[in-house]
Design a protein with these regions (language model features):
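An acidic, low-aromatic, low-complexity terminal/linker signal
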Residues: 1-154
Length: 154
């Protein structure tokens, strides 16, 4: 399995590519007043309103930098038996991919009850990589609320 790797500060994270629809350059986002600081805003992709989460804000508590390597990773957050639910993930330094054979899963399990979107930890030749469980980033209800809010500010 192929994984997209990105860096936030000194830490590396990975998203499994089967969930990735495409990777886009950073675009201007329409803000949603009153939403969580982790919600960077919304944009239109092929006619559909897409909410965007700022992964740096979510994981480190600070907004993503406007780097040339900052990307919007467009993922399908819907489960395989659900309709497509596009979600944008603002990620810094999203410039690398790894094959699963290039990493080892750390055997010890860490309880991420406060952060259910953090999954297995992997070890590469360079360092430790934390996998993201994209299906746990945003509930269906929260997603629907963001889409409804976007409709009122459009």
């Amino acid at each position: 399995m192929l994984m997209l790797v990105f860096r936030l500060g000194d830490n590396r994270y990975a998203i499994a590519t089967p969930a990735i629809v495409t990777v886009l350059p950073r675009v201007n986002l329409q803000s949603l007043p009153g939403s969580s600081p982790a919600v960077a805003g919304v944009f239109r992709y092929q006619g559909q309103v897409v909410p965007v989460l700022d992964l740096n804000q979510l994981l480190r508590g600070a907004a993503s930098s406007a780097l040339l390597s900052t990307r919007i990773v467009l993922v399908n957050q819907g489960a395989p038996d659900e309709p497509t639910r596009l979600l944008g993930l603002l990620a810094e330094q999203a410039t690398e991919t790894l094959e699963s054979h290039q990493v080892e899963e750390i055997a010890e399990r860490v309880d991420f009850c406060q952060s259910p979107y953090l999954s297995e930890m992997l070890v590469s030749q360079q360092d430790i990589i934390q996998q993201l469980q994209i299906y746990s980033l945003l509930s269906q209800q929260a997603y629907d609320e963001l889409i409804a809010q976007a409709a009122t500010v459009s």
